[in-house]
């Protein structure tokens, strides 16, 4: 038995926070050493933070990274008898690389650049970094003076190499490289690498952890090996939440797993594993042995350290079951942790939410409620950083210990029902009950006088008085009167956020929360610069369908029963007068259901469908509808998407949660001025509809894969 103890971690790094990032790195190294680990792995670009974006182009960023590394190397205890693997950008021959830097006993042994850049979805690493495309090549890297004065080294090696210790071989692949078809671990495993490490900067997306785990399991189950995975965790300054989930696997089995969602800044996990288990699996797999025999050798960098324990007092850790959260739990915990990080790092004193009594604002309020519950839980576990942040945010004395989530919410969460004569008693009462259930300080405000002042100003200018549709007005008048109410709410929300703490005699101001869902943004069913315009939006990347499942879960399992009432309510903007014969409905106004919108959104972004390919897909999936009806639905969606696309350019920064997000910032790049007629696209759809109408026999066979087998029976 040859056991080794290895450590990996989740770190809540913050882009460009060099002081805080360094403190967390140092603490993680100390924790790893205290647990007896001989190898410590950290997240991708952990010294500066993964989300620096165009700050990577600044030489200052490089300077501060080397300064931080110098602090680590200067302390003789930090790297004594432990391999420390840190992530940082490195400039080599005036080319910028995303690198792993391997330290031991105050020396740098290897700088290993990333070979494959993440360039899809939210990632654009190729904008800042160049991949190392020289397989099995190492070069001389000349160390900056700030480092050589400490290490006594003028140079070290940089490139595609393997670390050889006295008893095993180690190499790394970084984040995206795990997801590529020809991952580095394949060839390196065949060349004798037994321990693979992956310092990652992987953000949360619903159900993404399943993919990550499957890839790590596959990396070690096919031909044996030990795999360490590290990740950032938290909001590092943007729309993304890095969801941790550090883990250690051996031969396809998990032996240690960290949290996916947490308020803890530093989480270090370790596992003791037996190298002989890897060697036994590999040596008995003869097909693998034959391929290994043909593998071209990698350069090796020798490190004078023995990782294995010299006694029999360190038995291997047992296999554990991997913990997964349900999608509803992910919607609750991910944005809640993101909101806490955003609040504590913003320097502000709480959140303000316009609470309408509808599903979207109820879901947003519930996420704040869960955030408060997580704070209480962490404080009860002795998390000193969370307690310190809670006291500072709420301007509470040092002896204040939050023990009740509703009481804590009352110190930092403010809501208001911004009603009008078009609002119903049901939504007003519902908003009050939800606020009470969560614990917010709740206000009720009527906006009629404010909105009317705009209409009066218009009448004074034009000598005309616009009317609602219900009172004989034209569609233009009706829309303008709705929009002025919506925009009034936005201005009033910011005014309240600025002064509600002043009303209580407390310092600070509040962040304004938006609560527009992904579907409505995509359809453009919102007023530009209304309550959808806010500081941040925790639900802007989620569909109404996903939010409804979250509301059901939160109502049943997070002690928020009042929000369940929104599930049976008809979604309505309540911007038009309610009459005996008319009550405004979102789905009627939009001309499509939320279920349909969710499908359109996924096909448009995830499946990359234009109008024609979307119609071809749906005419099969919706075989119960006439092709002409499907065509009309698809055309209507793309028409409204085109005329409202400009609204997406001003969307409030939203938590990224799903692949169907319409986020205009860097995820869904498209023009914002369209020909809404879609002449060629719609003509092509019409031709397909005509062909289908001339072949009616196809109607009964579309989307019936089991029809042949049923006929045979």
From Swiss-Prot:
Known pathway: Cofactor biosynthesis; NAD(+) biosynthesis; NAD(+) from deamido-NAD(+) (L-Gln route): step 1/1
Amino acids binding ATP: 354-361
Keywords: ATP-binding, Ligase, NAD, Nucleotide-binding
One Gene Ontology term of the molecular function aspect: ATP binding
Protein name: Glutamine-dependent NAD(+) synthetase
InterPro entries: C-N_Hydrolase, C-N_Hydrolase_sf, Gln-dep_NAD_synthase, NAD/GMP_synthase, NAD_synthase, Rossmann-like_a/b/a_fold
Residues covered by region (Ligase): 324-703
NAD among keywords: yes
EC annotation from Swiss-Prot or TrEMBL: 6.3.5.1
One Gene Ontology cellular component annotation held by this UniProt entry: cytoplasm
Catalytic activity: deamido-NAD(+) + L-glutamine + ATP + H2O = L-glutamate + AMP + diphosphate + NAD(+) + H(+)
Annotated ranges, domain CN hydrolase: 4-275
Organism name: Dictyostelium discoideum
Active-site residues, as the UniProt record annotates them: 44, 114, 175, 356
Protein family per UniProt: In the C-terminal section; belongs to the NAD synthetase family.
GO biological process: NAD biosynthetic process
Keyword Ligase: yes
């Amino acid at each position: 038995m040859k056991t080794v103890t290895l450590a990996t971690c989740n770190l809540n790094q913050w882009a460009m926070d060099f002081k805080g990032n360094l403190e967390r790195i140092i603490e993680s190294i100390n924790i790893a050493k205290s647990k007896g680990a001989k190898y410590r792995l950290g997240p991708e670009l952990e010294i500066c933070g993964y989300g620096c974006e165009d700050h990577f182009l600044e030489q200052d960023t490089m300077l501060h990274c080397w300064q931080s590394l110098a602090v680590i190397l200067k302390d003789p205890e930090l790297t004594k008898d432990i391999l420390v693997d840190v992530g940082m950008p490195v400039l080599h021959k005036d080319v910028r690389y995303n690198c792993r830097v391997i330290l031991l006993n105050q020396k740098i042994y290897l700088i290993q650049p990333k070979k494959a850049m993440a360039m899809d979805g939210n990632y654009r690493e190729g904008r800042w970094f160049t991949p190392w495309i020289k397989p099995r090549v190492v070069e001389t890297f000349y160390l900056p003076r700030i480092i050589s004065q400490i290490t006594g080294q003028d140079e070290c090696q940089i490139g595609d190499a393997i670390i050889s210790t006295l008893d095993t071989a180690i190499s790394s692949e970084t984040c995206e490289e795990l997801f590529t078809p020809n991952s580095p671990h394949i060839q390196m495993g065949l060349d004798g690498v037994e321990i693979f490490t992956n310092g990652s900067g992987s953000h949360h997306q619903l159900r993404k952890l399943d993919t990550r785990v499957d890839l790590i399991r596959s990396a070690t189950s096919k031909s044996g090996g030990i795999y360490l995975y590290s990740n950032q965790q938290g909001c590092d300054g943007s729309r993304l939440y890095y969801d941790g989930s550090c883990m250690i696997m051996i031969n396809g089995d998990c032996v240690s797993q960290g949290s996916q969602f947490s308020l803890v800044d530093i989480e270090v996990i370790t596992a003791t594993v037996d190298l002989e288990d890897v060697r036994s699996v590999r040596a008995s797999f003869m097909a693998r042995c034959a391929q290994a025999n043909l593998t071209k050798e990698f350069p090796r960098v020798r490190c004078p350290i023995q990782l294995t324990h010299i006694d029999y007092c360190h038995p291997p850790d047992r296999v554990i079951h991997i913990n997964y959260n349900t999608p509803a739990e992910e919607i609750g915990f991910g944005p809640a942790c993101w909101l806490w990080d955003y609040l504590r790092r913003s320097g502000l004193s709480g959140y303000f939410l316009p609470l309408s009594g509808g599903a979207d604002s109820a879901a947003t309020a519930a996420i704040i409620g869960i955030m408060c519950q997580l704070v209480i839980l962490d404080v009860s576990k002795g998390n000193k950083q969370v307690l310190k942040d809670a006291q500072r945010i709420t301007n509470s004395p040092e002896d204040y210990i939050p023990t009740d989530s509703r009481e804590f919410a009352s110190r930092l969460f403010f809501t208001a029902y911004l009603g009008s004569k078009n609002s119903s008693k049901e939504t007003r009462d519902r908003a009050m009950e939800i606020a009470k259930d969560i614990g917010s300080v709740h206000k009720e405000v009527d906006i009629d006088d404010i909105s009317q002042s705009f209409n009066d100003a218009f009448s004074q200018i034009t000598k005309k008085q616009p009317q609602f549709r219900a009172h004989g007005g034209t569609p233009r008048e009706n829309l303008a009167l709705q929009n002025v109410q919506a925009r009034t709410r936005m201005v009033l929300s910011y005014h309240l956020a600025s002064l509600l703490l002043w009303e209580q005699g407390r310092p600070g101001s509040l962040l304004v929360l938006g609560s527009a869902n992904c579907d409505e943004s995509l359809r453009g069913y919102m007023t530009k610069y209304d309550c959808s315009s806010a500081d941040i939006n925790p639900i802007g990347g989620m569909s109404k369908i996903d939010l409804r499942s979250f509301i059901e879960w939160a109502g049943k399992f997070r002690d928020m029963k009042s929000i369940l009432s929104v599930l049976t309510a008809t979604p309505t903007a309540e911007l038009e007068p309610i009459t005996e014969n008319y009550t405004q409905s979102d789905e009627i106004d939009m001309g499509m259901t939320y279920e349909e919108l969710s499908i359109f959104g996924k096909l448009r972004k995830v499946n990359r469908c234009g109008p024609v390919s979307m119609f071809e897909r749906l005419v099969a999936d919706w075989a119960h509808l006439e092709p002409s009806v499907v065509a009309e639905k698809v055309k209507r969606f793309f028409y409204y998407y085109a005329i409202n696309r400009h609204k997406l350019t001003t969307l409030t920064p939203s938590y990224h949660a799903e692949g169907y997000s319409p986020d205009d910032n860097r995820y869904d790049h498209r023009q914002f001025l369209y020909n809404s007629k879609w002449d060629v696209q719609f003509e092509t759809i019409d031709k397909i509809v005509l062909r289908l109408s001339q072949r009616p026999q196809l109607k009964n066979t579309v989307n019936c894969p089991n029809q042949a087998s049923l006929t045979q029976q």
